Design a protein with these regions (language model features):
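Juxtamembrane helix-boundary/capping and inter-helix hinge elements in multi-pass membrane proteins
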Residues: 67-74, 109, 187-191, 199-202, ...
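Membrane-water interface of transmembrane alpha-helices in multipass transporters/channels
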Residues: 32-39, 76, 232-241, 268-275, ...
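Transmembrane alpha-helical segments and their short flanking loops
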Residues: 332-458
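Transmembrane helix boundary and interhelical junction motifs in multipass membrane proteins
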Residues: 55-59, 218, 289-297, 328-333, ...
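Membrane-interface alpha-helices at helix entry/exit sites of multi-pass transporters
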Residues: 74-81, 206, 210, 306-320, ...
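Small-residue-enriched core segments of transmembrane alpha-helices in multipass membrane transport
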Residues: 81-91, 200-202, 240-256, 276-283, ...
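Signature of multi-pass transmembrane helix bundles
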Residues: 3-9, 13, 20-28, 32, ...
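Helix-loop-helix junctions within the multi-pass membrane cores of secondary transporters/permeases
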Residues: 144, 279-362, 416
Length: 458
C-alpha cells in the first residue's frame, strides 16, 4: 500500500508539472482555438463533477457513522476524553485558521440571519439541494402620505433572503450529528441503522478510491486551463501570502493553542513535550505521514513522556487516526482563499459551513486515501464554492503537507499526555487489581472498542 501511495503521489506531482508546462506552451508558443480550450476544460470538469457527486453523501454518512460508533458503555472514560480532546483541538485549529485568513485576507460583511436559517433548515432532505442566502436590496416606499417635493428619499435598504441552489452543509452536519446521537441512544434497536450508515460510508469511500485514480489526469487538464486563464500574475503574490498564513497558523496552533489546552487540563509545563517528542516531529516532517511516524511517536510517548505502555499502545493509534489539526488548518485556510480569489463575499453561514466541513474532513482523513488534493475539492464543492481554482493550490500542497503532518503528530502527543493524566486514577486501580489477571483482560478494561467489538490494533 505504501508503494502504491508513493507511485500515486509521484504521478500527481508529475502531472502537475506537465500541466503547467503544457499550459505555458499553449499560451505563448502554440495558441489554440476556443473549441480546443473548451475540450481541455471539459476534461478537467469531469474530475470536479465526479467528486461533487459524492461529496455531500460522504460528509453526511461520515458524521452519522462516526457518532454512532461512539459507545461509552464499551469505551469508558478514555473514549470520552479522546472525543473531547479531538473536538476541542480541531475546533481550536479551525478557529485559528479562520481568524488568520479572514484577518490577513478580509472577506465581505457577514450576515448572521443566514447562519440561523441554515442552522435549522426547513427540511433535512431539502438541505441536500438548497441553502439560505440573504442580501441587502433597495426597495421603494409606497406611501401616499410622503411628500416627494420635500426631497425625502422614497427608498430604503432591506435585507431580502431566499433559498438558492447548493447543499446546505451547515444544516446537514447539524442534523446528521443529531440523527447519529438519536440512533446511538436507541441501543440494540438502532443496530440496523448503524450498520446501514457505516456500510454506505464504506461504499462511498471505495468509490472515491477509483475516482482518485483519475485525479492525476484531471489535475493535468485543470492546470492547463488555469494557466491559459491567467491574466493577472499577481496571483503569485497571493500564493505567497497564503503560504505565510498557513505557516503562521501552524506556528500559532503549535506554540500557543496546544500548550494552552495541555496546561488547562494538566497544570504542567507544556513546553517539555517538544523536547520529549522531537524525534517524532522530525520523522513526521520527513515522511509526511502520521501512520508511518506512529512507531517513533509510540517510542517517544512511552520512553520520554512516561505514558503507561498499555494505555499508550491502545489509545495513540486511535488519536493519530482522527486527530488531524494541521490538515484542518490547511483545509479551512485554502477554502476561504479560493473564495476570496473568486471574489465571493462569504456570509457567516458560509464561514461556519467551511469550518465544520473542514473539521469533518480532517476527522475522516484516514478513511479516504491520498486525501490531500481531494479533500480541498471535497470541501469546496460541499459548500458550493468554485472548485476549479483549486488547481493553483496543487503547486505547493505537497510541500505544505510535510509541515501539516508535523502539527498532526504534535497534537497527538499533547492529546496522549492529557488523556493519560485524566485517566491516571483508573490506571492506578488497574495496577492494584492486576494480580491474577491476564494482559488481555487488563487491555479490555483500557481499550476503546470498535463497533464490532474488536480491539483496534496498535
Amino acid at each position: 500500500m505504501a508503494n502504491i501511495t508513493t507511485v500515486y503521489q509521484r504521478s500527481l506531482l508529475t502531472m502537475i508539472a506537465l500541466g503547467i508546462g503544457t499550459g505555458f506552451l499553449l499560451k505563448f508558443r502554440f495558441p489554440i482555438s476556443e473549441t480546443t480550450e473548451s475540450l481541455i476544460d471539459m476534461a478537467g470538469d469531469v474530475l470536479l463533477t465526479l467528486l461533487q457527486m459524492f461529496a455531500v453523501p460522504l460528509i453526511v454518512t461520515s458524521v452519522i457513522s462516526g457518532v454512532t460508533a461512539l459507545n461509552t458503555k464499551l469505551s469508558g472514560k478514555a473514549a470520552v476524553y479522546i472525543l473531547i480532546y479531538v473536538c476541542g483541538s480541531t475546533a481550536t485549529a479551525v478557529s485559528i485558521g479562520l481568524f488568520l485568513v479572514l484577518t490577513i485576507e478580509p472577506g465581505a460583511d457577514t450576515e448572521t440571519e443566514d447562519f440561523e436559517s441554515n442552522m435549522a433548515p426547513e427540511s433535512f432532505f431539502l438541505a441536500f439541494f438548497e441553502h439560505y442566502e440573504s442580501e441587502v436590496v433597495e426597495v421603494s416606499l409606497i406611501d401616499n402620505n410622503i411628500d416627494y417635493e420635500s426631497g425625502q428619499n422614497d427608498t430604503e435598504l432591506k435585507i431580502k433572503g431566499e433559498y438558492v441552489d447548493g447543499a446546505n452543509m451547515l444544516g446537514l452536519i447539524v442534523w446528521s450529528f443529531t440523527i447519529g446521537i438519536l440512533i446511538n441512544r436507541a441501543g440494540r434497536r438502532g443496530k440496523v441503522a448503524v450498520n446501514a450508515a457505516r456500510e454506505l460510508n464504506n461504499a462511498i469511500k471505495i468509490i472515491f478510491k477509483y475516482i482518485l485514480w483519475y485525479m492525476p489526469i484531471g489535475i493535468y487538464f485543470l492546470m492547463i486551463t488555469h494557466v491559459l486563464e491567467i491574466e493577472d500574475w499577481t496571483e503569485v503574490i497571493k500564493l505567497g501570502k497564503l503560504i505565510m498564513v498557513l505557516f503562521l497558523g501552524f506556528a500559532v496552533h503549535s506554540i500557543i493553542g496546544l500548550p494552552i489546552i495541555y496546561f488547562a487540563f494538566t497544570r504542567e509545563n507544556p513546553f517539555l513535550i517538544y523536547r520529549q517528542v522531537y524525534k517524532a516531529l522530525i520523522n513526521a516532517l520527513t515522511m509526511a505521514s502520521s501512520s508511518a511516524t506512529l512507531p517513533v511517536t509510540l517510542q517517544c510517548c512511552e520512553e520520554n513522556m512516561k505514558v503507561d505502555v498499555r494505555f499508550c499502545r491502545l489509545t495513540l493509534p486511535i488519536v493519530s487516526t482522527i486527530n488531524m489539526n494541521g490538515m484542518a488548518i490547511y483545509e479551512v485556510v485554502a477554502a476561504v482563499f479560493i473564495a476570496e480569489l473568486a471574489h465571493i463575499n462569504l456570509s457567516a453561514s458560509y464561514i461556519i459551513s467551511i469550518g465544520l466541513t473542514s473539521a469533518v474532513a480532517s476527522f475522516g482523513a484516514a478513511g479516504v486515501p491520498m486525501l490531500g488534493p481531494a479533500s480541498t475539492i471535497l470541501i469546496l464543492t460541499s459548500v458550493g464554492l468554485p472548485a476549479k481554482d483549486v488547481s493553483i493550490l496543487m503547486v505547493f500542497e505537497w510541500f505544505v503537507d510535510h509541515f501539516a503532518t508535523m502539527v498532526n503528530v504534535l497534537g497527538d502527543c499533547f492529546g496522549i499526555g492529557i488523556i493519560s493524566h485524566l485517566c491516571q486514577n483508573e490506571l492506578k486501580e488497574l495496577d492494584h487489581s492486576a494480580s491474577g489477571r491476564s494482559i488481555v483482560q487488563i487491555e479490555l478494561d483500557l481499550s476503546c472498542l470498535e463497533p464490532n467489538d474488536q480491539l483496534i490494533p496498535s
